[in-house]
Amino acid sequence: MAKSKAYRAAAEKIDPAKAYTASEAVELARETGSSKFDSTVEVALKLGVDPRKADQMVRGTVILPHGTGKTARVIVFATGPAAEAAIAAGADEVGGDELIEKVAGGYTSFDSAVSTPELMGKVGRLGKVLGPRGLMPNPKTGTVTPDVARAVSDIKGGKIEFRVDKHANVHFVVGKASFSPEQLSENVGAALEEIVRLKPSSSKGRYVQKATVSTTFGPGIPVDVNSI
């Protein structure tokens, strides 16, 4: 597949033989982002874990200090006072059986889903719709909780989820190209700190084996893992 002229121009600014520090990489990502729109800045890590082993599954959340640059659409499965609290917290859509049926019909125009524990028996049946998209509420990520209002506030405030895939890679968003270098660096630092904190005790050898920073449709910028 041929690369675009803009991609090639961006790639020419990157020294493939160099491993950049995290701060250098985000600065370069800002420079190589698209001039036509505010590119999303992403980080990809290769971890020294075996995701096939249950005790080496790295999964968690972190609230980025400067948010993601995007206002997340959040739906909440809740009724009664919990539903009222979710609405007050700014949830985009709240409901019980009707919302569950809507999602069962294929509705997925949202970025995150939260549920009260009481409704998870019904929400759990939405696995075929929500599971492949990474949208299924989960206690481990704080999206199955009695305090749905706080969950909504956290997500709207820049909370991101990350999860190692079957190839031991982790991808996550750290902001927009319009962010300052300091904002991006602090977001990257917060995410990396949490991922490193979650290193499985059974993982041996180097934990973060490879790291790259990139923008939407942009080339990957190699990061020196020793700077992480």
From Swiss-Prot:
What is this protein identified as?
Large ribosomal subunit protein uL1
InterPro entries, per database record: Ribosom_uL1_bac-type, Ribosomal_uL1, Ribosomal_uL1-like, Ribosomal_uL1/biogenesis, Ribosomal_uL1_3-a/b-sand, Ribosomal_uL1_CS
Q: Which gene encodes it?
A: rplA
Q: How does it assemble?
A: Part of the 50S ribosomal subunit.
What does this protein's UniProt record list under function? Binds directly to 23S rRNA. The L1 stalk is quite mobile in the ribosome, and is involved in E site tRNA release.
Q: Could you tell me one molecular function GO term of this UniProt entry?
A: tRNA binding
Classification lineage: Bacteria, Bacillati, Actinomycetota, Actinomycetes, Micrococcales
Alphabetical list of PANTHER family matching this protein: 54S RIBOSOMAL PROTEIN L1, MITOCHONDRIAL (PTHR36427), LARGE RIBOSOMAL SUBUNIT PROTEIN UL1M (PTHR36427:SF3)
Write out the GO cellular component annotations.
large ribosomal subunit
| Family statement | Belongs to the universal ribosomal protein uL1 family.
- A GO term (biological process) for this protein? translation
| HAMAP family noted in UniProt | Ribosomal_uL1_B
Q: Which NCBIfam families match?
A: rplA_bact (TIGR01169)
Q: Which organism is it from?
A: Clavibacter michiganensis subsp. michiganensis (strain NCPPB 382)
Tell me which Pfam families the record gives: Ribosomal_L1
